[in-house]
Amino acid sequence: MTATLSLYNASVPGLIRMMDNLEHILRMGQTNAEDRGIDPSVFLTARLAPDMLGLVGQVQVATSIAKACPFRLAGTTPPVYDDQDNASFDDLYALIERTRSDISSVTREQIDGREAVEFNVKMGPVERSFTGISYSSGFTIPNVYFHITTVYNILRHNGVPLGKLDFFGGPSALG
């Protein structure tokens, strides 16, 4: 059987994988905080620069963008989460699990064939126009990677011994 690259294949499996990787990075951070006797809030509120979101905010944005993608590609409204309760590592794991579940709920049949379908997304005060493929490959995937990389960098900057393989979900994730 020959695999083909479809809009579904280019988005949904990778987004789920990115959520798995994000969870791995956070678990490394939580374990490191426990091992070093550091209050978890030190990591959860840390940021790379004063004008950037802290770790919790980075996770919230990564999950928000990731979960919206398949719904927008399918032409449906993405679920909205109440991000007020994300104050612990366990809260972030629950957010990631909910995101994975919502991403997985959109089917291949709902997405494939919609590569050229045009739609608008309101981003703050501005509305942007996309096609399915430009939204997935030009907006969603780069943004999710950016915010997950920032989580990785925040933890790394705070002494968590993360390596490149951890970004990909750990050594066992690559097979």
Where are these regions (language model features)?
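Long amphipathic alpha-helical coiled-coil segments
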Residues: 75-87, 157-163
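Structural signal for well-ordered, non-membrane alpha-helices
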Residues: 19, 23-30, 67-70, 97-104, ...
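Surface-exposed helix-capping loop/turn segments at secondary-structure junctions
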Residues: 29-36, 106-113, 157-162
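Conserved alpha-helical segments that form or flank metal/cofactor-binding pockets of metalloenzymes
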Residues: 51-79, 99-107
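C-terminal end-helix/capping segment
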Residues: 156-175
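Alpha-helical scaffold segments that form or flank carboxylate-/histidine-based iron centers
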Residues: 3-17, 39-64, 82-92, 124-143, ...
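Short secondary-structure junction/hinge motifs that connect adjacent elements
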Residues: 30-50, 114-121
